[in-house]
Each structure stands twice: as C-alpha cells, then as structure tokens.
C-alpha cells in the first residue's frame, strides 16, 4: 500500500475519534457544571472543570491568549466551532473529510458521503451557532456529533475490506482513543481527588455525581454497574477505564487494538511480527500488571 494512502486512512481514524471524544467531554462538562450551583465555591469549581477540559484538549496557552478565562461561554465555542483550533470538532471533521477526498477511489462512496455530509452540516451550523446555546440544544448538538462518528464507524465496518487500509484506520482510531482517555482520566482524576479532599466529611455525597459524570463521559456508567455491581468508587472507576480487557473505551482495550492492527500490517507486509512494526506495544505499559496497578493509580 502506498504510504500516502496509509497515512490518510490513519489520520481519518484519528480525526473522527477526536471529534467524538471532544463532543463527549464537552457535553458532560457543560451539563455537569450546571449542577454545581451558584455559590462562590461552586463558581470556582465550575471554572476548574472548564480549565481541566482545556488541559485535556492540550493547548491552554492558545486558548487563554484568545479567550481569557475558561467558562461555559468560552470553552464550548473554542472546542466546537473555532477553525483556528486544529483540535476543534469543526476542524477535525474538515481534516478527516480532506483526507478522504484524496481517497475517493480507495474507499466506499458511503464513507465519503458520511464525512462530506457532516462537514457541510457543521459549516452551516457555524453560521448560526448562537441558536445551540443552552443545555438542551448543546446536548442535542453533541449527541449528533457522537452519532455521526458511530454512523461513520458502522459504514466503515460494513464496507471496508479487511486489508492493510483497514488496519491503518483502526490503528489511528484506537491510538487516538487511548491517548485522549489517558489524558482525560489523568486531568479529571486529580481534579476530583482534590475536590474530595477539600470537601466536608468524607466528600462522598458531594463528589458522587462528579465520578458518575466521569463514567458517563466515557459511556461507562452502565458497563461499570454491570461489571462491578457496587457503588461508584475512585479505585474501581480507574480500574475500569485503565485496565478493563472487555470495555471498548478502556486504555488497555484500545492499546490491544492498536497492537493487533500493527501485527496485521506487519503480516501483510511480510515482516516478522516479533521484530517488525507489529512488535507488541503492551510491553510499554502497565496493562498486564492486573488490578494492583489500578489500586496504585487510585492511591
């Protein structure tokens, strides 16, 4: 396979996943901060959560230079419609569509149509983005972004031959998922633990909704209760999101999928899987360490 084609498919996988992950985190943050109340303490906590979201996005200096203070007024537009932000939802979909445009004869027409249609929809919404301000409209918008990602993945699963191109696209998708999940968990975990430590008493009544929101941002709330059948606790939340071998949005699951994709590419290229690009990436992390590692992460 030509390196140009492989590179484009890899980045399509990353950009579509990045758009979905940004929609997930922004949607949950928007609704979670609304429930914090209006006291001075709640206002400070609300700002901390918006600053955490900017930290997850990875470019706080650029955001502050343009928007100043992080809030529900400034962060969602920056992460959603700002074309100067290469990681905004609009930018990610535009870049995925641009990569796909050069592959019109290499991918199914349905894949191109999904990306092109959603790109055009987003461009239209940029011109009247003020109409989606408000909790309900924002939720519907971000839900549509997630559904677009799911539609694209479904069309891809149904139409793309399981050859090298498929493996490159999957490698990009799951590498992006592992990276964004690790970054989000790192930032959110420390923020919530600090808030719990400063809360009165044991902090459980105050912080339980925040941990539930963290699970919901990964679509992990129902899987958590199915797998653990216990109350929401920091240790088991970390265990699920980091180490679960069966939850598809866990870091371990995503890294294993990257590993499998690289192995398939190595085999297709006639490399030795033990020494070529398919060499296991699991040896680089704590994913085989079991739940003791989760306990360490949870303090």
Indicate where each model-derived feature is located.
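Alpha-helical transmembrane segments and their helix-helix packing motifs
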Residues: 1-299
């Amino acid at each position: 396979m030509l390196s140009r084609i492989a590179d484009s498919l890899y980045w399509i996988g990353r950009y579509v996943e990045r758009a979905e992950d940004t929609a997930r985190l922004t949607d949950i943050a928007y609704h979670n901060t609304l429930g914090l109340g209006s006291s001075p303490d709640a206002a400070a906590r609300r700002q901390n959560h918006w600053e955490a979201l900017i930290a997850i996005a990875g470019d706080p200096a650029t955001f502050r230079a343009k928007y100043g203070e992080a809030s529900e007024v400034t962060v969602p537009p920056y992460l959603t419609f700002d074309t100067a932000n290469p990681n905004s939802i609009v930018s990610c979909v535009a870049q995925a569509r641009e990569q796909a445009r050069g592959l019109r004869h290499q991918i199914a027409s349905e894949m191109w149509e999904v990306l092109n249609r959603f790109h055009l929809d987003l461009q239209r919404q940029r011109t009247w983005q003020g109409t989606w301000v408000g909790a309900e409209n924002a939720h519907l918008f971000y839900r549509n972004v997630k559904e677009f990602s799911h539609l694209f993945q479904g069309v891809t699963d149904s139409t793309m031959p399981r050859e090298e191109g498929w493996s490159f696209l999957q490698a990009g998708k799951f590498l992006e998922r592992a990276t964004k999940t690790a970054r989000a968990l790192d930032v959110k975990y420390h923020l919530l633990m600090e808030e719990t430590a400063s809360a009165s008493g044991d902090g459980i009544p105050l912080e339980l909704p925040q941990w539930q929101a963290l699970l919901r941002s990964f679509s992990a709330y129902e899987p958590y209760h199915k797998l653990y059948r216990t109350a929401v606790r920091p240790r088991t939340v970390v265990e699920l999101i980091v180490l679960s071998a069966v939850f598809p949005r866990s870091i371990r699951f995503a890294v294993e999928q990257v590993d499998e994709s690289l192995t398939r590419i190595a085999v297709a290229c006639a490399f030795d899987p033990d020494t070529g690009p398919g060499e296991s990436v699991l040896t680089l992390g704590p994913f085989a360490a079991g739940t003791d590692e989760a306990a360490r992460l949870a303090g």
